[in-house]
């Protein structure tokens, strides 16, 4: 087992991502609740609403029937170091850390029960 990086620690919950088959309907619903769009919109595949210091994300990239409940996004102090620690524990992420157009660096993995987790940091 590798020695973990001391600077790689969990800092808080960043976002919850939910799936939809109708982005315009979902955006209208959350805007009616007073949620403020910070990325995307009714005609986009991915929309993010600010919720204080966290976010509610909506994705229409379901690739068929919605088979999953969504994703938990957890902020970490250093995405690449945290990724290295995860790999050292024998856990295999879906992909190496990458930069997203919504200004986060992130990677995903699945827990033993099939829940998708994303570890991220704002760029």
Predicted regions and their residues:
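Vicinal oxygen chelate
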Residues: 1-9, 12-21, 47-50, 64-123
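N-terminal beta-strand motif that seeds the catalytic metal site of vicinal oxygen chelate
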Residues: 1-27, 70-72, 120-123
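Short secondary-structure boundary/capping segments
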Residues: 6-8, 39, 47-48, 62-65, ...
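Core segments of cupin and vicinal oxygen chelate
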Residues: 10-11, 17-56
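Short beta->alpha transition motifs characteristic of CBS
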Residues: 19, 40, 59-60, 108, ...
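A short linear hydrophobic-aromatic micro-motif
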Residues: 36-37, 57-59, 93-96
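Short, charged/polar, Gly/Pro-enriched secondary-structure boundary elements
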Residues: 54-57, 66, 114-116
């Amino acid at each position: 087992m590798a020695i973990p990086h001391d600077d790689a620690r969990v800092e808080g919950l960043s976002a919850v991502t939910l799936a939809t088959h109708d982005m315009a309907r979902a955006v209208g619903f959350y805007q009616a609740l007073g949620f403020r769009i910070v990325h995307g919109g009714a005609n986009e595949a991915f929309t993010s609403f600010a919720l204080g210091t966290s976010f509610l994300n909506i994705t229409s990239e379901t690739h068929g029937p919605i088979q999953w409940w969504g994703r938990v996004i957890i902020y970490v102090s250093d995405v690449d170091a945290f990724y290295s620690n995860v790999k050292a524990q024998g856990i295999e992420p879906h992909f190496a850390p990458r930069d997203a157009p919504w200004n986060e660096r992130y990677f995903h993995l699945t827990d033993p029960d099939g829940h998708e987790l994303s570890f991220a940091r704002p760029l």
